[in-house]
Amino acid sequence: HESPYRGETFVTRKITKAVGRISTGIQSHVTLGNLDASRDWGFAGDYVEGMWKMMQYKNPDDWVLATGETHTVKEFAKKAFDHVGLNYEDYVKVSEKYFRPNEVEYLLGDYSKAKKEIGWEPKTSFDDLVSMMVDHDIDEAKREKVLIENNLLEPTWEFPT
């Protein structure tokens, strides 16, 4: 469940936050872990709608809310950097420090039961989700840049030297 309000320690938001800052000149690079991990990333707003539909259903049950698509961390980073016209390979570094010891390589959800029984399916595409998050973080980075230029914010990230 991703959105522009996802915590900055989660990989999707770490990437989009870095893209926003890099594109405005206040960050030099981003360091990530396993670029080959695959996830089923969907928009939190779509999942909230799914939860509401679950609550309206006549009988309690369990349903999976997912997109039915999987994308790697590398794909997410590439799409995010492409959105601002940059090559992710120029800005992404990989460190073993960020590899999880018990990494699940591949996660994919099947929402067919939710579609059949409660009429739910995801509305936001992967491309739209990434673009939404990057656009939000570009706006935030522009505000951060003004604060940095006026000595009101000390960067705690990979700041260009």
Predicted regions and their residues:
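C-terminal substrate-binding subdomain of Rossmann-fold SDR/epimerase-dehydratase oxidoreductases
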Residues: 6-7, 11-161
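Conserved catalytic-site region of short-chain dehydrogenase/reductase
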Residues: 1-5
